[in-house]
Amino acid sequence: KPKIITAIGMFYDLEKPNEFIKDASLALDDKGIFIAQLMCLKTMIKKNDLGNICHEHLEFYSLKSLKYLFENNGLEIFKIQENDINGGSYRIFCRKLNKGSIKLNEGNILKAINNFVKRVKKNRLQTTNFINKKIREGKKVFLYGASTKGNTVLQYYNLNKKIIPFAAERSPEKWGKYTIGTGIKIISEKMARDLKPDYFLVTPWGFIKEFV
């Protein structure tokens, strides 16, 4: 039996998480470790990460829900690490269920979610007001990065090709294509620079250190 099983960057995409964890528990050596890396609800709320709510993310786990999920299927959480991957993630270490998971305290999640909704609405208003004001002044606003998560923000903010004509993108396979639902044309970074935009709206903000 394997001594280590990993689930990296895919745990929130699972259609049947209970079945997956139960199978992992059965397959794991009695002294083995199951490691899951995933974005959690706490991080999403703290950083106002609206873009995390996209088509491929089927679940958004609080630590309390993860504890319940793992313990119901034969595993317990014994260690949690936080990192900056994808704008902020958890690396969760589990073992066969014995004494129960470590104490996990997140505070009032429902209150945090309600505050998250208010902040997202405020961000939308501030961002769209700023962009529309600059366009009225004759400025050009482009996107930087045609990211999957960015599509959620663009659609919720109602930022389409009439407002933002182009998205600068590093990946050649995306050039000449369009953002989903908003129809913004994706071009190379060089082409975007040649057009001399006044502002870039960064959508893959979780990787901003790599290109600023």
Where in the sequence are the language-model features?
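Short hydrophobic/aromatic beta-strand or adjacent loop that forms the aromatic wall/cage
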Residues: 87-92
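Conserved S-adenosyl-L-methionine
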Residues: 75-86
